[in-house]
UniProtKB/Swiss-Prot annotation:
It comes from the Eukaryota. Belongs to the UbiA prenyltransferase family. The keyword Transferase applies. It is found in: Mitochondrion membrane. Keywords: Heme biosynthesis, Lipid metabolism, Membrane, Mitochondrion, Transferase, Transit peptide, Transmembrane, Transmembrane helix. Converts protoheme IX and farnesyl diphosphate to heme O. It is an enzyme of class 2 (transferase). Its main location: mitochondrion. GO terms for biological process: heme A biosynthetic process; lipid metabolic process. This is Protoheme IX farnesyltransferase, mitochondrial. The keyword Iron does not apply. The lineage of its organism: Eukaryota, Metazoa, Chordata, Craniata, Vertebrata. It comes from Pongo abelii. InterPro entries: Protohaem_IX_farnesylTrfase, Protohaem_IX_farnesylTrfase_mt, UbiA_prenyltransferase, UbiA_prenylTrfase_CS, UbiA_sf.
Length: 443
């Protein structure tokens, strides 16, 4: 029988030494399977798997012992900003400067300040002055009511009611009254003129009341009374009410209900439709043209009490005249309308603005030729009106082709004298009525 290794070693070494060697060999042989299994377990822990490479920052991980020690790839050093200064340890340290106090140092009244203290006082005074200037400018931009003088009130109310525009409205109403068939009634004519003027003042005042925040952004309208604070909004609304109520009452009771209804409808159309529509759509120009075409119709209905073909012809002439007039005006004010937030053809549709102006210049030729057909004027009127209608059509064509400020100004100034001259020619060439010149019937 073969002897085991530990028996051989124990035979060679006798005594205590042999016993110790025998015990160690036996212990080693018994513990070897357990150590082998323990070694396999530790080796499995040290293997690198796919999960070690699945980090978002792609860190290279190496396990040294049982605890995981991660070695991260060093990041590049950031570029030093002009506000940071590198220290000896390699870290960035923010450099903070102490600000000088704005308040001047207190000086005793018993001694005079020296030159150094005066130099320190100067920057603080400059800063305080700049702050005061900023506050003053901010206060200037705020709306505040100015002190109203009694002798300034008529001029302020005249500008609030747009007295020149009101005079134009009254003149077109008077032309419609004079062109209507029938005898000329002076009391009715005066009542119609006064009522129409009051209605126009009311509509213009309410229009300015609604457009205060927008008029302040335009050079053309920034000096209006409400924008400058020369009059309070309450006083402006009260003035508009005091004009609208008696104006509509005079037209309704003093003239006829039809004329009063047209006056009330025109106030509503101008204040509640045209005014808000100016910031919504370019259709405001067509609505505003209808507003301007109603006054001559009111003059016709005041004289006749009915809506005839002549009333619509006068309204059509005023309707077409307003497009070259206003489109040429708005062309030179495109920057102001855009800054004020108004939606105008000259700003959003410049090509359409020029085409519409030319189209209605040519329409004036057709409407003038229709006057004798409707038995309003004689045939001499379209012949006499041909030169001025042809001239404004030519300027409308130049405005359409050139599309510049010079051509728009020429068209605008031509429209200012074109309408009064055209209405004067209509009055001159008015067809006489046979019954008006006839004598009393024989008894």
């Amino acid at each position: 029988m073969a002897a085991s290794p530990h028996t051989l070693s124990s035979r060679l070494l006798t005594g205590c030494v042999g016993g110790c060697v025998w015990y160690l060999e036996r212990r080693t042989i018994q513990d070897s399977p357990h150590k082998f299994l323990h070694l396999l377990r530790n080796v499995n822990k040290q293997w690198i798997t796919f999960q070690h490479f699945n980090f978002l920052k792609r860190m290279y991980v190496t396990q040294l012992n049982r605890s995981h020690n991660q070695q991260v790839r060093p990041k590049p050093e950031p570029v030093a900003s002009p506000f940071l200064e590198k220290t000896s340890s390699g870290q960035a340290k923010a450099e903070i400067y102490e600000m000088r106090p704005l308040s001047p140092p207190s000086l005793s009244l018993s001694r005079k300040p020296n030159e150094k203290e005066l130099i320190e006082l100067e920057p603080a005074s400059v800063i305080e002055d700049s702050i005061d200037v900023g506050k003053e400018r901010k206060e200037e931009k705020r709306w505040k009511e100015m002190k109203l003088q009694v002798y300034d009130l008529p001029g302020i109310l005249a500008r609030l009611s747009k007295i020149k525009l009101t005079a134009l409205v009254v003149s077109t109403t008077a032309a419609g009254f004079a062109l209507a068939p029938g005898p000329f009634d002076w009391p009715c004519f005066l009542l119609t003129s006064v009522g129409t003027g009051l209605a126009s003042c009311a509509a213009n005042s309410i229009n300015q009341f609604f457009e205060v925040p927008f008029d302040s952004n335009m050079n053309r309208t920034k000096n209006r009374p409400l924008v400058r604070g020369q009059i309070s909004p309450l006083l402006a609304v009260s003035f508009a009410t005091c004009c609208a109520v008696p104006g509509v009452a005079i037209l309704t009771l003093g003239v006829n209900p039809l004329t009063g209804a047209l006056g009330l409808f025109n106030i509503f159309l101008y204040t509640c439709c045209y005014t808000p529509l100016k910031r919504i759509s370019i259709a405001n120009t067509w609505v505003g043209a209808v507003v301007g075409a109603i006054p001559p119709v009111m003059g016709w209905t005041a004289a006749t009490g009915s809506l005839d073909a002549g009333a619509f012809l006068l309204g059509g002439i005023l309707y077409s005249w307003q497009f070259p007039h206003f489109n040429a005006l708005s062309w030179g004010l495109r920057e102001g309308y855009s800054r004020g937030g108004y939606c105008m053809m000259s700003v959003t549709h410049p090509g359409l603005c020029r085409r519409v102006a030319l189209r209605h210049c040519l329409a004036l030729l057709v409407l003038s030729a229709a006057a004798p057909v409707l038995d309003i004027t004689t045939w001499t009127f379209p012949i006499m009106a041909l030169p001025i209608n042809a001239y404004i059509s030519y300027l409308g064509f130049r405005f359409y082709v050139d599309a510049d400020r010079r051509s728009s100004r020429r068209l605008f100034f031509c429209s200012l004298w074109h309408l009064p001259l055209l209405l004067l020619l209509m009055l001159t060439c008015k067809r006489p009525r046979g019954g008006g010149d006839a004598g009393p019937p024989p008894s």
